[in-house]
Amino acid sequence: MMPEFGKYAVTILASWGATLVLLAGLIAATLIRGAQVKRALKAQEERMKNDG
C-alpha cells in the first residue's frame, strides 16, 4: 500500500528516514535525561533525610 511518489520518492523517503532518526534521538535523550534527574533527586532526598 505504498503511494506512488514518482520522481520525488527518494527525497520523500529520505525525509521520512531523517525524521524518524531525529525523533528516536530526541526520545532517547529525553529518557536518558529523565534517568539522570531521577538519580539526582534520589541523592538529594537521601542527603536531606540524613541531615535531619
Curated annotation (Swiss-Prot):
Classification via Pfam families: CcmD (PF04995)
Signal peptide extent: none
Function: Required for the export of heme to the periplasm for the biogenesis of c-type cytochromes.
Location of this chain's protein in the cell: Cell inner membrane
Keyword Lipid metabolism (UniProt): no
Record protein name field: Heme exporter protein D
Transmembrane regions listed in the UniProt entry: 12-32
Source organism, top-level taxon: Bacteria
Organism: Rhodobacter capsulatus (strain ATCC BAA-309 / NBRC 16581 / SB1003)
UniProt keywords, alphabetically: Cell inner membrane, Cell membrane, Cytochrome c-type biogenesis, Membrane, Transmembrane, Transmembrane helix, Transport
GO BP field: cytochrome complex assembly; heme transport
Gene: helD
InterPro entries: Haem_export_protD_CcmD
A cellular component annotation (GO) from this entry: plasma membrane
Recorded family membership: Belongs to the CcmD/CycX/HelD family.
Membrane-protein topology: Single-pass membrane protein
